[in-house]
Amino acid sequence: GDDLGFLTCFALKDGKHKWEFKTDARIVGTPAAADGVVVFGSADANIYGINAKSGKLIWKHASSKAVLGAVTIEKGIAYIGGSNGSFYAIDIKSGKLRWEFTGVKGYIETRPLIYDGKVLFGAWDNNLYALDKATGKKLWSWDANLTRMHFSPAAVWPVAADGRVFVTAPDRMMSAINATTGETLW
């Protein structure tokens, strides 16, 4: 995606232009593709599902504000955050909303992590959120206790291993968080 609102597809084999799809505003977040569908958000306040071969629109889900978040897809469900304080789980084949979590106070642009039945993502309200992957229910949130927004979990993509979630803020400090409870380990 680009600042002009185009999502462009190039052939993996030779880099030749295959298709492009135009939205009404810039595309900021990294798209994701699975099962022949490319999913991405746009600053035009929509989330799109595009046919990966043809570049044709399959579905469009409207949001109330720009959707700048990167997408993660797992088992046919796309997970993406918006600028309206909402986080979405959408069926990639039908575009049907599985659930929407509306408890975020800042906008979301980070790429979600799927780990141990949870969806984890940071937001510009200085929190890292853990939602139940199946229901969208908030399990916990972790406050970075930082006074500057730019040292927020929103600016990083979380990773996880051995029951711990790791985030490194732009100040280069790494934190380990218990993936079950959201408690800071170090």
Please describe what each predicted stretch is.
Residues 3-6, 17-35, 42-46, 57-74, ...:
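Extracytoplasmic beta-rich repeat domains
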Residues 11-15, 51-54, 91-95, 132-135, ...:
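Short loop/turn segments that connect beta-strands within beta-propeller blades
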Residues 40, 49, 89-91:
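Type III/flagellar secretion export determinants
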